[in-house]
Amino acid sequence: MLLLPRPANYHLNCQKLYQFLVASQKNCDRNCSQIVSISLEIDSIDPLALLEKLARPHQLNFYFENKSKGEAIAAIDAVAQLQLAGANRFHLTQKFIRSCLKETDIFDSSNHTFAKPYFFCSFSFFSEATADYPFPVATVFLPRWQIARQGDRCVLVANLSIEADTNIDVFIQQLWRKIHEITSIEQPENEGNHFQREFSQVDVSSIDRFKQAVIDCSELIYEQQLSKVVLAHAIDVQANTNFNLFKCLNRLRQMHPDCYVFSTHNGKGQNFIGASPERLISIRDRQLFTDALAGSISRGKTTAEDTVLANQLLQSEKERHEHRVVIDFITQSLQELGIAPQLLSPRLRRLANIQHLWTPIQAKVPIDVHPLEIVAALHPTPAVGGVSRQLACKKIRTYEKFERGLYAAPLGWVNHQGDSEFIVGIRSALIDGDRARLYAGAGIVAGSNPDREIAEVRLKLQALLKALI
């Protein structure tokens, strides 16, 4: 059965689509092409299931889900892409998006939030890589196929290239054939995702080295050279079989429903995945939301113990100071862009195995400020970098003997009208066949204790490992 628009609208849509494509083709010069973005509402389906069926090892793809909001989006293959490095990567990405949009005609029969062109982006923590790392410093692509679900509504977006000599009838036939293939994919039965594999794990650098780094940074903080620095630790996991990306993602969204579950594939066999509690920015209709998320403690085994731990977190001078540093940085960075932030009441962000101090921040974005300008201003926040930013990042390079890559870095999307959502790629792992590198970090401020900091890191790593193994 062809799961396309309802029969009453099918002929009308085909007729309108044909007229749209003919008009778009007239915009093509003899030696150039035009991108057409075609959106169509389809029956509800799990975007992760489609990603599993349609993803190919040699193609870029991206997955982004916020289960608590009932939103999931899968982007598959690229009709246009850019990969680059350097300090001006955010600006060049912004130019690329604007250039693509100038060459894109839009056909939307769905009136869906996730219709029309969306550009998917990943940026590494540092603007230049110092070690061999499988992902570029910056990647942005317009997907050839995009499937998004919001609540019980689902939209398919096809971004395709059309040329001056394209046969429109054949083009439409091929499009409907592909749509039929996509919408005919059967969603798998829930087979259960409890799987155990044999594995070994090793610290990328020693625990003693991490503890010494905490001591050294604490001395710099005492000397007032730094206010905060975030130190990461990584473990390498070797399994006896290849990791099943889609089962891992499914486990992550089941285990961490209050987090952003994400995955990006580089087209060369490696995936970067995770479940991040930290939103960098979310913009809808020029309304900005961001999070100050810093200061943490474990969850209790009982309700009473959980309450005791929460009160300890709320009353901890060290944790509150760490949180305040992040708030001050975000508000100042937004003000420098001409954005007036409003702080909502502070609260706790309770996750499966950890709880954080959390202050939501919102603001109205001026019409002349692009989302990537905000991303560039905020990254890295003190929640993943430190204060002062430049010295903290220098110390991170000194003490961490591995490439952060996409860890603690911005991943997300920007659409055609300036809506955007980016998360911070923490609680994450680099997957390569039967190998995985898992990352987690801890914020070092005045009063930090090396044993407590490594315990916090291990808590975060074990939660991620549980989803993979």
Q: What are the residue ranges of the model-derived segments?
A:
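An N-terminal JmjN-like helical accessory module and its immediate linker preceding a catalytic domain
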Residues: 1-87
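Cytosolic ligand/metal-binding cores
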Residues: 1-11, 15, 151-183, 275, ...
